[in-house]
Structures are given as structure tokens and as C-alpha cells.
Amino acid sequence: MAAPTAANWDASTVSSALKEYYSRSGIKDTCYSQSTLCLLNPAKFNIKKTPVSGSQFVSPIQYAASGGLGMTVTTANASAKEAEILRWVVTPKKVYKKDNISTDLLYSATGDPAGAFFNASQKIIDKARVDLAVELERRLFGAGTGQIGTVSSVSGTVVTLTNAADARNFEVGMSITDTVAGTNITQVTAVNRSAGTVTVVATTGIDTLNDSIYRYGFATLSTAGVQGLQKQFPTTRTSANTVHTIDQSTDWNRLAGTHVDATGASPYEAVTEGVMQAKAEGGDPTHLIMSFEDLSALMNDGQGQKMYSVGDPLQIGAKIIEIAVPDGGLVKVLGSAFCPASTIYALNQPDLELVHWGSELMNIQNNDGSILHYSDTDDVWNVRQLAMFDLIVNTPAKHAVITL
């Protein structure tokens, strides 16, 4: 008979008697919880916020001077004309956020570290607010179409995006669709953000080169979406582009900002040209906003230029910097996860306005003022939040969009 083997008490031996214990630090959030433009970190870009009521918000703009000039009274009188005055007409664009929590979890997860590592009701409310704010950030950079990516190729259920950076628009579990009408709906099961690929349950409708991908729930209203920076400052200017009822093609620079095609130029040369051309039109950009990839290229290219580090570190490690431009001024430089690649916005901060109906992010309340809603059909509680807003650039001529 074999000799007995010594047995030691170790963790596996007494695993049934060990408790699970969590600190009060809660769940660490690895989602995009930083907002460059407005809501979560106004220290970066403190956009003006204007609460309004009624069905629409109106802001007039003069984009052409009056006539009446001549070397004689006769010619001055003959050329007399009124100034060209239009008005932006802004209507609210709605974005809803809803999260459910079962009754048993609501009462089990109370935040007591001896039993649960988070307070379920507080977590769902706080996280819903952050998620909605991040979605607004994404929309403020958009073109109002609801499109979040296009197809480059498909292999099995893996979709390679035309622009790898668009992978930031996707989340595991997200429902996506192929058309404005939402004809085919599928779910995201995996995202490779470095490779720019998205794995889905089925690729029906998103299996051909250049097929558009929309987030379900936004596609049906894609023609009435938030008028974000891509819509306000288009880089393709071959046909009419209407923003807040104004056709920008009447005077592209005055009504859509200066477009600088800096393809082939170094990043520093590109931003310098963009800022200077905006100044030539009477503008005075205060901020440059770009993708983090373009920000990295600019910082590497600007090693020999005068650059300053200011402000607090961003969450992912980059710092806000200021860059010197030829007229001796300084312009802040910011990165955003949702800014389109190879596109830089030279913006005059005081001129951008976030018009919102109600508070910026509203909790939809019950009659008694509570914000948790109960559904006896499913035995769940839910929190419902709403944002009604849009972006207005009052005098686009003060800004520039730069294509790298």
C-alpha cells in the first residue's frame, strides 16, 4: 500500500467557506466616459449651453453686406441693396436612454460591501447618465445621418470597417441595422478596436463594400438627426447642404466655415493654414479638435515648434496642449474619440452653442417625483432619461475644417 500523502490546508481546500468581499470602490468603467465637447468635462471645451422652450429656437445671421457703393451718387444709388440676413431655425432632436433592473437585484445590491459591491439603483442611474452624455458627444461630431460605420469587407460574421476608428461607435450587445428603415437588425458580439472589426450575429444587409451601418433606434430618424460638426462644416461642397433651414451653398465660407484641403501637408502646416484662413475670414479659432491619432501625429510633427502643456491629464494619458500659430497667438489642442479621422476642426469656442429643451440630461419622473419606474409585467424597474437638444454655430465664418 502506498504511503499517505501529506495534505495541507490551502485556498482550494476551504473554498466553500471563503466569502467573496469587495471594496467600496465599485465597478471600474472602461467605456468612453470622457466628453470633449460639452457635458462631462467642461474644463476642456466649455461650450455655451442655452436652455430654451417652445417649438424652435431662432438665431439671425447677416452673411452679406448691403450695397449702395459707387464713385458717383448715381452709381451708388443704382447699386443699392439691402443686407443679406437669414436665420437659423433650430428644432429639438431627442435621444432617449432606458435601463432595466430586476426587483431581486434592486434589493440585493444595496452597496453593503459584505454583500454587494455596488448600489444597484445608484449605479443604473449614474451609468445611464454617463452613457447618454457619451452618446450626445458622438452625435455632436456626426452628420445627422445616424450612420456609425461603413463596410470594407466581410469574412463570415466579422465585418471590417472602412475606417478602423469607427469601431469606437460600436459596443458589445448593441443592435445595429443596415438601412434607414431598419430592414435587417443584428447584434454585435465582439469588437476589435485596434483592427477596426466588428463581429455580429448575422451580416445580412451589411455584407457588401460601402454598405452603411446604423445604430438601431437612430436609423429611422436619420434624416432628422443632430446637426453635428460634420453637418455644420461639410468637407464636400459640390451640392446644396441645408443646416437649420439655411442652404450653406449660397456662401460656403460664410455659412459653413472655411474648408482647407491640406492633403499631403504635415499636421503642423495643416493646422497653421486652417487657423490663418479662418482669421482671414474674420474668425479667431480658440481650439483645434481632432482624433487622438491625428493629435499624436501633430505632437510628433510639432516637436520643433512652440507647444505648451496645460490643464489636467485626460483619462487616456494625453494632455491638453497649446500650439503657437504664426500671428503669435496660442490655440488649445484637444483629442476626441469620436472626431472623424483626418479631419481637424478649428473652432471659436464662444460661437458654439448647445441649445437644449429642459435640463441637459433629464430624468423622466413619475408623478410622485421618483425616477425609478416599475413594470409589473416584467417585474423590473427602469430609469428613463431624455436629452432634447441640437448644436448651433452662430457665425460659421469664424471656424475652419481641415482635411488631412
Residue locations for each model-derived region?
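Core alpha/beta structural scaffold of self-assembling particle/tube/pore-forming proteins
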Residues: 1-70, 79-404
